[in-house]
A protein has these predicted regions:
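Mature, function-bearing regions of proteins
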Residues: 17-18, 30, 116, 175-180
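Conserved metal-binding segment of the jelly-roll/cupin
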Residues: 119-139
Length: 180
């Protein structure tokens, strides 16, 4: 995974929008974002490593989704736009990329800047509950992702706004990163 500050140039969300300013693992950790690279091997040993992380974080369920034009059909454009709306979740968001690639953009709270995390096969990302973020495919227009969940699979997005800013999960997140 490669992380960097996004440029502020308008344009296709699937383009890199690379400002040239790299982000260190320490900066990502300071905002609660964790990542690992677990190479995908033909024997399937990567599954054990991913499930080990899931167990450590008390995740019990997972599913696999494919995001591309073929799998989403007529809903492709609307789904992609929906994923790109700035939002947060009340649970951690854990994603492991099996095939393809895409971007998770996370807000750096102190500056309101976007940090773009370009993920590809073998990358595992954990976003803390309460962090504002969004997702976009890159120019490959396809990704296959394992989603991990504490309980039953669910994906409830709370789009950014005054009400969401006051959400207890959001306020707890902000407090947790201000302590550091």
């Amino acid at each position: 995974m490669r992380a960097y500050f996004m440029d502020d140039i308008p344009g296709d969300q699937r383009l890199p929008h690379d400002s040239g300013r790299e982000i260190s693992d320490d900066v990502l950790r300071s905002i609660g974002v964790l990542h690992w690279h677990i190479p995908i091997d033909g024997a399937g040993a990567y599954k054990d490593e991913v499930l080990k992380v899931a167990k450590e974080r008390e995740y019990k369920n997972h599913d696999v989704i494919v995001i591309n034009k073929e799998s989403l059909g007529d809903e492709f454009e609307s789904k992609i736009k929906n994923f790109y709306h700035e939002h947060m979740h009340e649970d951690e968001e854990i994603r492991y990329i099996l095939e393809g690639s895409g971007y998770f953009d996370v807000r750096e709270h102190a500056t309101e800047s976007w940090i773009r995390c370009h993920m590809s096969a073998g990358d595992l990302l954990v976003l803390p509950a309460g962090i504002y973020h969004r997702f976009s495919l890159d120019m490959t227009n396809r990704v296959q992702t394992m989603r991990l969940f504490k309980d039953e699979p669910k994906w409830i997005a709370h789009n950014r706004g005054k009400e969401t800013d006051a959400n207890p999960f959001r306020t707890q997140y902000v407090k947790s990163i201000e302590v550091q």
